[in-house]
């Protein structure tokens, strides 16, 4: 019944779209991470290409700004030997009033095989996935506050790389959880993979009321929230999504919730520090932590290419 209800899976329980980590069986999440391991080695070769998507067309549709996600998706598709097309939204017919689905129909008529979609509206990738032909696949690159599944997966890959086993891990997600699609994806992924304890840490105004229902512990004090943690994931303040004065100032936020070397000492000595980017130094995290030995922020970016290669190669191999 799970497979029939989940629009990401076909009738055989195979992944045909990646829309959200929520509802994905553990074996599929693990399969993506295992497949990504094979692609990490590709990036270490002199010729960083494999022919798995040769002849396939990947369309990147980013209706919101992006650096890391858009670029790593483009690199990932090219390393799979796909033909990659980046739609310039500002100059496209969408800017002239064309509907999202009409845009999709026109690009589908150009023989698109995979759509990578980032959109400000939650649910937009789901709408596209329900609309496209059975042989076309949709990968969610972030939709509103809802989900950012490939970021969640690359975060899990990074954690697994450094910590091996999730079952004994305590993970703290610190910052603007309210507006963060990454936080929700990470929580679902950590829960699916059996993390011992997941915490969210932030001001009361930036922590959603449903966090406890998601099986996480909520802290409104940074020192208490990261004490004894194995992994600390910091999130930026998403001022572009804030409609009111949820915080007094960035300086006040840093004073209470900014991750400094002194505060990081409350976590375990071998704790790793992660950040999905973009980083706002001196707001959610101190430069000394970003550039310090416990930060694995740049490896996250590197692993992100392999994870996105894994996702596209897996969905492209399955039919609806």
Swiss-Prot record:
Signal peptide: none annotated. L-aspartate binds at residues 96, 181, 236. Keywords: Pyrimidine biosynthesis, Transferase. GO terms for cellular component: cytosol. Carbamoyl phosphate binds at residues 68-69, 118, 148, 151, 277-278. The keyword Lipoprotein does not apply. NCBIfam families: asp_carb_tr, PRK00856.1. Belongs to the aspartate/ornithine carbamoyltransferase superfamily. ATCase family. This is Aspartate carbamoyltransferase catalytic subunit. It comes from Acidovorax ebreus (strain TPSY) (Diaphorobacter sp. (strain TPSY)).
């Amino acid at each position: 019944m799970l497979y029939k209800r989940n629009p990401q899976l076909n009738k055989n329980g195979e992944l045909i779209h990646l829309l959200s980590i929520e509802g994905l069986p553990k074996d599929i999440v693990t399969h993506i991470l295992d497949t990504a391991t094979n692609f990490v080695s590709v990036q270490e070769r002199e010729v960083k290409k494999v022919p798995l998507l040769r002849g396939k067309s990947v369309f990147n549709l980013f209706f919101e700004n992006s650096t890391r996600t858009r670029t790593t998706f483009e690199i990932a598709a090219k390393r799979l030997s796909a033909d990659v097309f980046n739609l310039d939204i500002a100059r496209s017919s969408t800017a002239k009033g064309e509907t999202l689905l009409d845009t999709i129909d026109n690009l589908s008529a150009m023989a698109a095989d995979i759509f990578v979609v980032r959109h400000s509206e939650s649910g937009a990738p789901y709408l596209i996935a329900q609309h496209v032909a059975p042989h076309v696949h949709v990968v969610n690159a972030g939709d509103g506050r809802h989900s950012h599944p490939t970021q969640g997966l690359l975060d899990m890959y990074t954690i697994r790389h450094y910590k091996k086993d999730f079952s004994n891990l305590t993970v703290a997600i610190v910052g603007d959880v309210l507006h963060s699609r990454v936080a929700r994806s990470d929580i679902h992924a950590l829960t699916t993979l059996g993390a011992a304890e997941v915490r969210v840490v932030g001001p009361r105004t930036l922590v959603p009321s449903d966090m406890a229902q998601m099986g996480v512990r909520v802290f409104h004090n940074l020192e208490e929230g990261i004490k004894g943690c194995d992994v600390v994931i910091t999130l930026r303040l998403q001022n572009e999504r804030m409609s009111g004065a949820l915080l007094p100032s960035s300086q006040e936020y840093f004073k209470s919730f900014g991750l400094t070397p002194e505060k990081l000492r409350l976590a375990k000595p071998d704790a790793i520090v992660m950040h999905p980017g973009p980083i706002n130094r001196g707001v959610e995290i101190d430069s000394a932590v970003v550039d310090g030995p416990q930060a694995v922020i740049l490896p996250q970016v590197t692993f992100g290419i392999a994870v996105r290669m894994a996702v596209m190669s897996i969905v492209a191999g399955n039919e609806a």
